Design a protein with these regions (language model features):
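Terminal domain-initiation and capping elements
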Residues: 1-149
Length: 149
């Protein structure tokens, strides 16, 4: 029996936030850190590329060796509109930081969205940094499996 329209969860566009840090201003460091961040966002929220409306990436001004959005393309986000920008250069703020805001079409309520803050970026949102321990080797294997060649 088909569901009545009022029984289905509405699909809305939700913001999913995340941040990480890179070890150095080097192309591969930026891409690796961004892929790790995106992989955790994808896995924690069960995000499918077809459900992503857009994503905005920002880096602190000390990271300019590569566009972090390239990491999303490498993970198969080929049709997703992506934008990169720099964060405001606020004295004393976290350095070598990559942030992302993913606009995701989902039926999940806001309180079920998992925001991901890892590495040094955990200090930006300690209230949202309570992920279970990350098995970095297993995560890298997942990234390798899901990276476009």
């Amino acid at each position: 029996m088909p569901e009545k329209p009022d029984q289905r969860a509405a699909v809305v566009c939700r913001g999913v936030r995340g941040a990480t840090t890179a070890e150095a201003n080097q192309r591969e460091e930026i891409l690796t850190a961004t892929r790790q961040l995106l992989a955790l966002l994808i896995r924690q929220n069960n995000i499918q590329p077809a459900d992503i409306a857009s994503a905005i990436f920002s880096t602190t001004p000390d990271l300019n060796a590569e566009f972090p959005a390239l990491a999303a393309r490498q993970l198969g986000w080929l049709e997703v509109p992506l934008l990169c920008t720099h964060e405001a250069n606020v004295p004393g703020s976290l350095q070598k930081c990559i942030r992302v805001m993913v606009h995701w079409n989902t039926d999940k309520p806001q309180n079920e969205i998992v925001h991901v803050y890892i590495k040094e970026a955990t200090r930006l949102r300690p209230d949202l940094s309570q992920l279970p321990p990350v098995d970095w080797d297993e995560l890298e294997a997942w990234i390798t499996e899901h990276t476009e060649r």
